[in-house]
């Protein structure tokens, strides 16, 4: 998957308002993919790893909120973005 393919994919997946939970999750997923691609060449970039962990935590909190408010939308979004579902506690 090329760099521009993923951005177009996330923009085409969700076309509602920019501030909605789904669009925020799409943007965070896009940033996560870019950072993981960055780590393939820069393995010891620990400050960026910390930023990645913060982004992952923010996306996880948004996914929990989406699951609690709209379970069907959560399921659709996780399948469209091809991300794993949350673990049950």
Curated annotation (Swiss-Prot):
Record-level GO BP terms: translation
Cell compartments where the protein resides: Plastid
Primary location class: plastid
GO cellular component terms, A-Z: plastid; ribonucleoprotein complex; ribosome
InterPro entries: Ribosomal_uS15, Ribosomal_uS15_bac-type, uS15_NS1_RNA-bd_sf
Source superkingdom: Eukaryota
Pfam families membership: Ribosomal_S15 (PF00312)
Alphabetical UniProt keywords: Plastid, Ribonucleoprotein, Ribosomal protein
MF term (GO), any: structural constituent of ribosome
PANTHER family: RIBOSOMAL PROTEIN S15, BACTERIAL AND ORGANELLAR, SMALL RIBOSOMAL SUBUNIT PROTEIN US15M
Family: Belongs to the universal ribosomal protein uS15 family.
Oligomeric form and interacting partners: Part of the 30S ribosomal subunit.
Protein name: Small ribosomal subunit protein uS15c
Naturally occurring in which organism (per UniProt): Aneura mirabilis
């Amino acid at each position: 998957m090329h760099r521009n393919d993923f951005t177009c994919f996330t923009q085409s997946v969700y076309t509602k308002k920019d501030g909605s939970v789904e669009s925020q999750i799409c943007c965070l997923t896009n940033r996560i993919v870019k950072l993981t691609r960055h780590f393939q060449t820069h393995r010891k970039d620990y400050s960026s790893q910390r930023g990645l962990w913060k982004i992952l935590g923010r996306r996880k909190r948004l996914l929990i909120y989406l699951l609690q408010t709209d379970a069907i939308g959560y399921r659709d979004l996780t399948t469209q973005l091809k991300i794993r579902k949350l673990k049950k506690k």
